């Protein structure tokens, strides 16, 4: 649940509970029923919606509301706790009350104006880069993203949980910045003059703890569907847009002219700095006694097919991949 909450994974958790009259309710007790536990209050801080069903005729309402909230806006987990007597109750499906969605009202005219302004800033830059996170994947904005990087050759970096968003062999790919990342990519970030983060919340693992120095020479712009991330980020932003990543990319693409490419010197710099500071060093490949983990992952990547699935644990296996 905590991972789904932090990584914005839409998910529905349904748990069984003791009979409603055997729950602690508002008594302040720790337990009444056999093996009872107040799971709802425990998961409230890491879910978008958590409820114990007290009326069997409201089951449709709770299920529909949970599904809507799980997938609406920034996705996340929801939890429905169903007592045993509610599970056993007879209901008339035709009479069940449903949930009426209330979608957020967006001023698209104002939003589009902001996006066009970002496009104008990009056109004035000489050393631009994009930093793309899982928000792009969640919004299914890959189509517009790929069009942008293919047509305009803008160097782009990925966050760890968006590593499979676009192939790492792409000519404009510059790696992953951050504390556990690529040194060359960090140099690129620090030398950019236009830094656009889309669908990534810019945690300390990316910016470092002295976040005031992150991309210090760049106009820093952040696009995120969660306004709280925009307000509470540790990076001083020049522009911030609360917006779905797919909508932003689609509108951003429309705002760009047919021809625009970053400076050739900048593209050459990005290429050379990554060559100068590779992840897999030559000495890694010449180890005799043991297999170097970085060399192993690099070799494994060469033989994996596009549809192969790789599951990693934390620690070295996670960082290495």
Regions found by a protein language model. Give the residues of each.
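Generic structural signal of hydrophobic/aromatic residues within well-ordered alpha-helices
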Residues: 43, 118, 252, 266-273, ...
